[in-house]
Amino acid sequence: MLALRLLNVVAPAYFLCISLVTFVLQLFLFLPSMREDPTATPLFSPAVLHGALFLFLSANALGNYVLVIQNSPDDLGTCQGTMSQRPQCPPPSTHFCRVCSRVTLRHDHHCFFTGNCIGSRNMRNFILFCLYTSLACLYSMVAGVAYISAVLSISFAHPLAFLTLLPTSISQFFSGAVLGSDMFVILMLYLWFAVGLACAGFCCHQLLLILRGQTRYQVRKGMAVRARPWRKNLQEVFGKRWLLGLLVPMFNVGTESSKQQDK
């Protein structure tokens, strides 16, 4: 349990450090290299378009990250008390997390990167957090590849060029042919690629469970769920104003039925 609580502190710090490093690289390396194009107009220059897109992806990722933490699970105490109070206990899908010491309605899993449990109150923000984190990482990887290609005069036309970039760069780094800053960017390329794929896969997995009306906790425990149309399952999580929530980080906009289940 001590190791889990320690991981609950280290993982958010790791995520915030990676986010800070990404912002620094975008601001001081990638954007200045795009400003060197003299043929581009000031309004539609690559630097402006790249900065606007990266800011949009990052704002949604960090905004939903904060909302996942703010929409924390309910405090412990719902099932405690006398026998007369026991009928008010939550449904079987409710779970008590020993790491959070809280009760989560429609518990899915505990996310160490947010230091919080994922349930009915923050599932929507968690999925959008995974989506925009994946997009931000993959987009940063593409921008980093363009930067490395221009600085080191490397062509990525070959399908295996990205796979052979790391071992080749390591040997050139120790021989003095590659600067330390460029080597750091190359390492970040693979980190962005790994995090982007992991978040994309996790987002798709969560969406599949939502379409089925299930949570990871219910699947792990073998709990039976009531069959419902997939549209209703999506609306329960994302609400009727799903498009607005997809573009702007905002609190849960679930339907009235989902709000009643949280009570």
Swiss-Prot record:
It comes from the Eukaryota. The active site is at residue 111. It catalyses: L-cysteinyl-[protein] + hexadecanoyl-CoA = S-hexadecanoyl-L-cysteinyl-[protein] + CoA. Residues 91-131 form the DHHC domain. It is found in: Endoplasmic reticulum membrane; Golgi apparatus membrane. Residues 31-48, 204-263 are lumenal. The keyword Iron does not apply. It is a multi-pass membrane protein. The chain crosses the membrane at residues 10-30, 49-69, 126-146, 147-167, 183-203. Its main location: endoplasmic reticulum. Residues 1-9, 70-125, 168-182 are cytoplasmic. Keywords: Acyltransferase, Endoplasmic reticulum, Golgi apparatus, Lipoprotein, Membrane, Palmitate, Transferase, Transmembrane, Transmembrane helix. Its EC number is 2.3.1.225. GO terms for biological process: protein localization to plasma membrane. The keyword Kinase does not apply. GO terms for molecular function: protein-cysteine S-palmitoyltransferase activity. Palmitoyltransferase that could catalyze the addition of palmitate onto various protein substrates and be involved in a variety of cellular processes. Catalyzes the palmitoylation of KCNMA1, regulating localization of KCNMA1 to the plasma membrane. Might also mediate palmitoylation of CNN3. The DHHC domain is required for palmitoyltransferase activity. Belongs to the DHHC palmitoyltransferase family. Interacts with CNN3. This is Palmitoyltransferase ZDHHC22. It comes from Mus musculus. The lineage of its organism: Eukaryota, Metazoa, Chordata, Craniata, Vertebrata.
